[in-house]
Amino acid sequence: MKKKNLMCLFLAGTALLSSCEKDPDLSEMDGDFTVYTQYDPDMDFGGASTYYLPDSILTTGQGMQAAYWKDENAQTLISQVKEEMDGRGYTRSTEKTGADLGVQITYIENTVNMVGFTGGYWDGWWDPYYWGPFWGGGWYYPFPISYQYNTGNIVLELVDLRDSDEGESGKCLPVVWLANSEGMLSGSTRIDLTLVQRAIAQSFTQSSYIQKQ
């Protein structure tokens, strides 16, 4: 599969980009997902208090435009992430400005590889302006990445927004935690909502360092 680039996720002061793509359907699957998590050991998770979580799930749709999954199933998954973050002592912010952490949920529609990345700025399958101009000039992983995102995976990421200086357009932000849930198949296989919720819960269970002090 060819690599896909994503355009900016958020536009400050404007509505989210619309998409003509269908929302992913949900049906039963067998077996739990394999959940892979990784984080920046230098990140001060305990010092963060607030987080911003959008009301849609980003999808790696066709073409160069970002697509958004917003139906009731998407809202169920977003609520699951909110419950996990709230349970760790963080408070959801209704405004992007001033939030300590940014939370991103992504549904992978095209298999992609991230192999041999050893830190620093990433110029691979995701556009470096993935978080949009509001978050700064781009983003990067401060830890090594070397694996594949398969079609149907759900990926969770936390970005440290405290590294963003208001008005500094060239500032790149660190992705300080990611969770990749594998187990969803391509083709006619559809996502099972219950399994995704369990994978989200497992992502946080094996990430005890995400905790407000």
Please identify what each model-predicted range represents.
Residues 1-7:
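Bacterial N-terminal signal peptides that target proteins for export
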Residues 56-107:
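N-terminal segment of the mature soluble domain
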Residues 47-49, 99-101, 150-154, 175-177:
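Envelope-exposed proteins and targeting segments
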Residues 21-26:
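Bacterial lipoprotein signal-peptidase II cleavage site
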Residues 163-202:
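Short secondary-structure boundary motifs at beta->alpha junctions and helix caps
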Residues 29-47:
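Post-signal peptide N-terminal segment of mature Sec-exported envelope proteins
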Residues 104, 109-157:
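Low-complexity, compositionally biased segments in intrinsically disordered regions
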Residues 16-19:
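C-terminal motif of bacterial Sec signal peptides marking the signal peptidase cleavage site
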